[in-house]
Amino acid sequence: MSFGIICYKVENGEIRYVMIQRKDSLAFMEFVRGKYNQTDINYIKQLVDYMTENEKEMLLENTFDAIWNYTWCQSSQNIFKHTKEYIESKTKFDYVINNMCFVNVIKSSKVKCNYLEQEWGFPKGRKKVRENDIDCAIREFCEETQLYKDDIQIAKEINPFQEIFFGTNNILYKHVYYIAKIVKEKSKIFLDNNCLEQVREVRDIKWLTYAEVLSHIKYHNIERIEIFKKAHTIITDSLLL
């Protein structure tokens, strides 16, 4: 379960929302971390179909270590390469990348690639030990936007929205979003290359209008589209009075 914030501000009479673009697609991350059965070519094909063209090229043209370093933004000598996850993920990668069936899956998928960029969404993340829901949402929001806690005000009178769906791995996911507004006019969102928590997860960040938000959410994220529409209606009808 993840907790996040749908944050808005009013600029020149128009509501705008903070959206972040993931650094990597969920499918790419799942593949790099070895979250698959290495003999299940159908599921691997499904993962590949949800990757961007650049991610597919990366798998074909780079060693596992290079991909791992890129994914976690770490040096080639990082000690985490001795972890169980690294060893198991590398073993699976080496197995499938040397299988011509897998290589052909990527090449055929590249021809019909529908995903030109990583997905956009609202800042969110998972709780730390003994962290409550709203504190998690605020911390993740601040890490991913570089805003401060006192830059925003949570609308505590509005019940949080729940995005519940089954992922491509058939696992049920639940994202909980609070509504918040910007209370400091000079607050700025930006990418900080020195903030590891942000650069590992975020590729881009923008303020977007209602129409732009809808155009940035991928068509298969039906639940995200619906909760955003509901949130926008409540903000328009109740919070701007």
Per-range role (PLM):
Residues E30, D65-W68, W72-C73, K110-K124, ...:
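Nudix hydrolase/Nudix homology domain
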Residues Y148-N159:
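A short coil-to-beta-strand element that immediately follows conserved catalytic motifs
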Residues R16-R139, E143, L147:
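Conserved Nudix-box catalytic region and its N-terminal flanking loop in Nudix hydrolases
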Residues F3-C7:
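Short beta-strand scaffold segments in enzyme catalytic cores
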Residues M1-S2, E157:
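Eukaryotic beta-rich interaction modules
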Residues S2, E14-R16, E117, V202:
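A structure-centric signal for secondary-structure junctions around beta-strands
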Residues N12-G13, D24-A27, V183-S187:
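Short, charged/polar surface micro-motifs in flexible loops or helix N-caps
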Residues M1, E11, N170-L172:
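A short catalytic or substrate-binding loop motif that flags glycine-/basic-rich loops and adjacent residues
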